[in-house]
Amino acid sequence: MNPFHSSCWNTSAELSNKSWNKEFAYQTASVVDTVILPSMIGIICSTGLVGNILIVFTIIRSRKKTVPDIYICNLAVADLVHIIGMPFLIHQWARGGEWVFGGPLCTIITSLDTCNQFACSAIMTVMSVDRYFALVQPFRLTSWRTRYKTIRINLGLWAASFVLALPVWIYSKVIKFKDGVESCAFDLTSPDDVLWYTLYLTITTFFFPLPLILVCYILILCYTWEMYQQNKDARCCNPSVPKQRVMKLTKMVLVLVAVFILSAAPYHVIQLVNLQMEQPTLAFYVGYYLSICLSYASSSINPFLYILLSGNFQKRLPQIQRRVTDKEIKNMGNTLKSHF
């Protein structure tokens, strides 16, 4: 999620510019904005960075990469892109909304963060469709479910995400607000522009992909229940029932989708509510920052879900560790030999 965005929902400076003049509420929000929130985001940043690098490293070093591995690797890369912008966000919040890194970096960080939003939603949607065909229609679209074509599909999704984020590349800049604070924000001066952009971002990154994701997994659950009933009635092993490995992968993606909904829904609801508010209340302010924390927390939680829910990752990590250790021992032996 992009807290750098539009002038109507960027930082505490922007929200206070909407004539929110209650002294206690403002002081409370200021403490949250400059102390508590940067600390929380910093913890999320450090754990998410380690976890996602571990996932990407594990998949890249794996000898047998599966189609789901490619999607998971791209989601981990997207989470890393999300995390890269965190230190800049922390710095801006800690300084009361002031941006000191210049206009070009403001545009790059804001645009990459938005591109990441589009990419995460698109990859999650396509991965859900892939799980549906792998489980319910295993003999359809098999030519498209190869590793090579899956890589091309993911590259296409990233390219489309950059195109969809073009408005941010154009309009994100350093803006000087009425209180004199220069912040990195999305320069939308017209209320109509704010309305249309908010709807554009909310629909394309959440409300459009969400039904597709839910439909895929509802169909998967219906199919699984039907196969279970057939086996139970026939009292035999039906070869069409998904294998344990596929079921584990499906369970993993189901949990990831649940995390996607819980982390993204509050943020987008807050944006829609903000369109109707003249003066933000303390409750709105708290909800706004909680939604940002939830959105960034998902980038930290996802890699640990991959490890906990996937038997493949649990097996691969020790194997890769042994391979790396053996390689280091071999290199050390060669180094010692060269000195004697």
UniProtKB/Swiss-Prot annotation:
Main subcellular location: membrane
GO terms for cellular component: plasma membrane
Residue numbers on the Extracellular membrane side: 1-34, 93-106, 173-198, 273-286
Subcellular location: Cell membrane
Membrane topology recorded in Swiss-Prot or TrEMBL: Multi-pass membrane protein
SUPFAM superfamilies: Family A G protein-coupled receptor-like (SSF81321)
Cytoplasmic side: 58-69, 130-149, 222-252, 310-340
Keyword annotations from UniProtKB, A to Z: Cell membrane, G-protein coupled receptor, Glycoprotein, Membrane, Receptor, Transducer, Transmembrane, Transmembrane helix
Superkingdom per UniProt: Eukaryota
GO term, biological process aspect, one: neuropeptide signaling pathway
One protein family per Pfam: 7tm_1
Glycosylation sites: N10, N17
UniProt-recorded Gene Ontology molecular function terms: G protein-coupled peptide receptor activity
TM region(s), chain numbering: 35-57, 70-92, 107-129, 150-172, 199-221, 253-272, 287-309
Classification via PROSITE patterns: G_PROTEIN_RECEP_F1_1, G_PROTEIN_RECEP_F1_2
Tissue specificity of this protein: Specifically expressed in the brain with highest levels in cerebral cortex, hippocampus and hypothalamus, and lower levels in caudate nucleus, putamen and thalamus.
Role: Receptor for melanin-concentrating hormone, coupled to G proteins that activate phosphoinositide hydrolysis.
Recorded family membership: Belongs to the G-protein coupled receptor 1 family.
Cross-referenced PANTHER family: MELANIN-CONCENTRATING HORMONE RECEPTOR 2-RELATED, NEUROPEPTIDES RECEPTOR
Identification of the protein by name: Melanin-concentrating hormone receptor 2
Species this protein is from: Macaca mulatta
